[in-house]
């Protein structure tokens, strides 16, 4: 399968890319930092630079894909100030909207989309 992964340089993303590579899947990564991705991920993957808050990803990064796994998100550690909460929310919601906009514009979109985020999961931390 050809699988597009966002958030591939994070904890879950790196483990997922490693396993998918072992399985023989073709991997394309959408990342904010292509240089970092090329340094920490296997060399046999395609890497596309994408700012998930500024608009849809490059259309060519999604072409021919069978599935998309969307893992992008602002790290949650640290004090949850109003500004931090906004960054967490935007990193998950805006990035998903931008990704979906690109997928909706495709003639042959991927048949599977998995998005793993939790904007409301953590609850009141007393901050």
Q: Which sequence ranges carry the predicted segments?
A:
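Conserved glycine-rich Rossmann-like NAD(P)H-binding loop of the short-chain dehydrogenase/reductase
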Residues: 25-32
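Alpha-helical structural signal in soluble globular domains
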Residues: 15, 19, 40, 98, ...
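NAD(P)H-binding glycine-rich loop region in Rossmannoid oxidoreductase-like domains
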Residues: 35, 39-95
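SDR active-site strand-loop-helix element
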Residues: 6, 30, 68-72, 113-119
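Short glycine-/acidic-enriched loop or helix-start segments at secondary-structure transitions
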Residues: 14-16, 39, 79-80, 123-126
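N-terminal Rossmann NAD(P)H-binding glycine-rich loop of SDR-like oxidoreductase domains
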Residues: 3-23
């Amino acid at each position: 399968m050809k699988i597009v992964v966002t958030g591939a340089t994070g904890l879950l993303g790196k483990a997922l890319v490693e396993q998918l590579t072992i399985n023989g899947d073709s991997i394309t990564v959408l990342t904010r930092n292509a240089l970092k991705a090329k340094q920490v991920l296997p060399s046999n993957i395609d890497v596309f630079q994408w700012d998930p808050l500024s608009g849809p990803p490059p259309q060519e990064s999604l072409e021919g894909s069978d599935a998309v796994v969307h893992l992008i998100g602002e790290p949650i550690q640290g004090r949850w100030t109003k500004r931090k909460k906004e960054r967490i929310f935007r990193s998950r919601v805006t990035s998903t909207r931008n990704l979906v906009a690109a997928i909706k514009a495709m003639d042959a979109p991927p048949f599977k989309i998995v998005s793993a985020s939790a904007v409301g999961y953590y609850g009141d931390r007393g901050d």
